[in-house]
């Protein structure tokens, strides 16, 4: 799964790209690990590289 780091600027680009709607929007964006398919679309879209693979 991917995670959103503190670098997130809450722009919404990632949520728009997620094919399974695993990203919840808010002041802090979060990725639902149960829904995430590891496609990487969100990370590719992030303008500040705030989305990284979980260790």
Curated annotation (Swiss-Prot):
Binds 2 [4Fe-4S] clusters. Its cofactor is [4Fe-4S] cluster. One of its GO terms (molecular function) is metal ion binding. The keyword Iron-sulfur applies. Disulfide bonds: none annotated. [4Fe-4S] cluster 1 binds at residues 8, 11, 14, 46. Keywords: 4Fe-4S, Electron transport, Iron, Iron-sulfur, Metal-binding, Repeat, Transport. It holds the Pfam family Fer4. Residues 2-26, 27-55 form the 4Fe-4S ferredoxin-type domain. SUPFAM superfamilies: 4Fe-4S ferredoxins. [4Fe-4S] cluster 2 binds at residues 18, 36, 39, 42. Ferredoxins are iron-sulfur proteins that transfer electrons in a wide variety of metabolic reactions. PANTHER family: PHOTOSYSTEM I IRON-SULFUR CENTER, PHOTOSYSTEM I IRON-SULFUR CENTER-RELATED. This is Ferredoxin. It comes from Butyribacterium methylotrophicum.
């Amino acid at each position: 799964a991917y995670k959103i780091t503190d670098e997130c600027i809450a722009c919404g680009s990632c949520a728009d790209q997620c094919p399974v709607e695993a990203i919840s929007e808010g002041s802090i964006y979060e990725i639902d690990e149960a829904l995430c398919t590891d496609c990487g679309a969100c990370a590719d879209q992030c303008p500040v590289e705030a989305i990284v693979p979980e260790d």
